[in-house]
Amino acid sequence: LAPYEQTARLCFDKYEMYQFLVKNQIRTARTCGSWPEFDRAYRAGEISFPVFVKPRTGSGSVGARRIDTPELLKQVMDQDEGLIVQELMTGQDLDADVYVDTISHQPVAIFSKRKLSTTIGGANKTISFKDERLFAFVKEALKAFRFNGPLDMDLFYQDGRYYLSEINPRFGGAYLHAYGAGVDFPAFIYHNVKEKTANTDHIGKYDEEIVMMMYDSVVIKKLDEIQSEMTTI
C-alpha cells in the first residue's frame, strides 16, 4: 500500500508536481517557483494579483497566505526562498478520497466532497456530491501517475472546469466522511492485501448531500460521572 518512492517525492514537492502536471497537460493553477520566475510571468500578463503563497514542501497549510501587492510578495520571498507562488483560485474548494486498486492498478473508488470549512489545512466540515465530469477528470489525471491504495486529492472547480491542486498518497484527514457514507477503503485493502483479489468498481456509489462535521470540544466532569455515562452506553 505504500506509494512508489518517486511518486511520493513528486507529491511532496509542490513545484515539481506543478511542472509534472503541466507536462502531462493536467489542469492546475499557474505556479511560480521563485521571484524572478514570477516577475517574468507577471510582466507577461500570465499571472496577476492577488496571489497565493505557500511552502514548496509544506504541509497543513502552515505558512500559506494571500498576498495582494508585488512589494509584499518580493519581501516575503526574499525572506523565505522555499515559497512558491500560485494564482489565487476563487472557485469551489474540493476534495476527493480515491482508492487505486493494488491488483488492477485502476481507481475503483472516488468520493468527492465540497469543503465547507477548514482548520489547520484540513477540512472539518464537508458535504458529498457527485459529478461524472469530476470522476472522468480524476481518472484521466491518474493515468500519468503510479499509485497504490488510498489517496487524498485537493481540487478546485472554477469557470466550469476542474483543476488538480495536490495529491497526498495516503488516507486524507477527512476520509472518515467517505467511510461514514459507505465508501469502505479498509475492505478494499483487505481484498487486495489479504485475499489478493481485485476490487470491483465503486466509483460514485454513495449518496449526495451527506454532511460531515468534525469539531473540538471540552468536557469537564467528575470522574465518577464520566464512568457512569460510559457504563450506560
PLM regions and their residue ranges:
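Short, acidic/small-residue loops that bind anionic groups at enzyme active sites
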Residues: 1-9
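Active-site nucleotide/adenylate-binding loops and adjacent lid/helix of ATP-dependent enzymes
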Residues: 8-90, 102-104, 132-135
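A generic structural signal for short beta-strands and their flanking turns/coil linkers
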Residues: 49, 92, 149-151
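A short, flexible beta-alpha/helix-coil linker loop
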Residues: 57-59, 117-119, 170-173
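Phosphate-binding site of ATP-dependent enzymes
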Residues: 65-146, 156-157, 161-163
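ATP-dependent carboxylate activation and anion-phosphoryl transfer catalytic cores
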Residues: 130-233
